[in-house]
């Protein structure tokens, strides 16, 4: 029987709403951590509590944030060209990649325990250890603009190559392979490992969700609104959820490619990052100054 797909959506205020909530992740402490890209803040929202903030340089442009294997929160400073590490015990530490003006953006923990990041402006992939040692690896195509990155099922890192119109795979020795997308100018951005062992991604330029297996086989699923500009994606249970930055919606896709989308309460809220919280709900960073809690209510 077809499932009735409904959700409950509530918005939560954040400190400095003009700061622009952008990236979001569930921390090892059970709290939600998110970036405020326009004001240079890292914020923490504990369950049932109020948000607290940690200040960076105002123009640092914190973008993507994730939990490291060392229990710290790591994030990219896209405009300051740094990688940041934050703990309640040690405070803030920042590291600059060897390549100047690299534009670090995507960030994910690898199976090797290191943090891997994209250098969007430099067209490279970087690796940083918990001690701050950084290595950089080139890509086979110049100007690829690598965006999001995720650990794959195969002891490798996978990434979206936005301007190369491809999905990339990088082994831990720095060898990169690109898989070209069937749709021209698809401009992939978001990326997540799915429950089926494949990588799922958003095509912001084509209005589609894509899927790539470890051997490079690609499928694409058109969204109901091809102009919706899907941005970030995350796995939850046996489905994946994504943000539609250009259409003020969140959506989900199941492993058979069935899609449903849901309007956000505030018009033009600019949904970007999305994460699964400790409470099992989806939490979305809205660049217009709030977080949205999306609680699926599925009935068979």
Curated annotation (Swiss-Prot):
GO cellular component terms, A-Z = outer membrane-bounded periplasmic space
Identify the keywords attached in UniProt to this record, alphabetized: Antibiotic resistance, Lyase, Magnesium, Metal-binding
Note whether Metal-binding occurs among the keywords: yes
Classification via InterPro entries: Streptogrm_lyase, Vgb, WD40/YVTN_repeat-like_dom_sf
The keyword Magnesium is assigned to this record: yes
Q: Pfam families from the xrefs?
A: Vgb_lyase (PF24684)
Q: Which cofactor does it need?
A: Mg(2+)
GO term, biological process aspect, one? response to antibiotic
Q: Which residues bind Mg(2+)?
A: 270, 287
Q: Which residues bind substrate?
A: 231
Top-level taxon: Bacteria
Which Enzyme Commission numbers does its entry carry? 4.2.99.-
GO MF term list: carbon-oxygen lyase activity; magnesium ion binding
Positions of the catalytic residues: 272 (proton acceptor)
Subunit structure and binding partners = Monomer.
Role, per record: Inactivates the type B streptogramin antibiotics by linearizing the lactone ring at the ester linkage, generating a free phenylglycine carboxylate and converting the threonyl moiety into 2-amino-butenoic acid.
Task: Spell out the family assignment given in the record's similarity comment.
Answer: Belongs to the Vgb family.
Q: By what name is this protein known?
A: Virginiamycin B lyase
């Amino acid at each position: 029987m077809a499932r009735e797909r409904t959700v409950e959506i509530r918005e939560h205020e954040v400190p400095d709403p003009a700061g622009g909530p952008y990236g979001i992740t569930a921390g090892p402490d059970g709290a939600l951590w998110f970036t405020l890209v326009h004001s240079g803040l890292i914020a923490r929202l504990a369950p049932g509590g109020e948000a607290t903030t940690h200040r960076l340089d105002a123009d640092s442009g914190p973008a993507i944030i994730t939990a490291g294997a060392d229990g710290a929160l790591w994030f990219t400073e896209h405009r300051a060209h740094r990688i940041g590490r934050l703990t309640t015990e040690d405070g803030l530490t920042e590291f600059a990649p060897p390549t100047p003006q690299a534009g670090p953006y995507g960030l994910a923990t690898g199976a090797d325990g290191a943090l891997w990041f994209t250098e969007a402006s430099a067209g490279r992939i970087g690796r940083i250890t918990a001690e701050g040692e950084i290595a950089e690896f080139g890509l086979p195509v110049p100007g690829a603009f690598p965006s999001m990155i995720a650990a794959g099922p195969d002891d490798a890192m996978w990434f979206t190559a936005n301007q190369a119109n491809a999905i990339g795979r990088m082994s831990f020795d720095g060898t990169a392979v690109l898989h070209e997308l069937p749709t021209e100018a698809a401009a992939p951005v978001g990326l997540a490992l799915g429950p089926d062992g494949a990588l799922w991604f958003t095509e912001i330029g084509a209005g589609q969700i894509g899927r790539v297996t470890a051997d490079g086989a690609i499928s694409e699923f058109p969204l109901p609104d091809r102009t919706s500009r899907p941005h970030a994606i995350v796995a939850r249970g046996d489905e994946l959820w994504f943000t539609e930055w250009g259409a003020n919606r969140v959506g989900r896709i199941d492993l058979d490619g069935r899609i449903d989308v849901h309007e956000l309460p505030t018009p033009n809220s600019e949904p970007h990052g999305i994460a699964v919280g400790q409470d099992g709900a989806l939490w979305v960073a809205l660049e217009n100054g709030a977080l949205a809690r999306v609680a699926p209510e599925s009935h068979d």
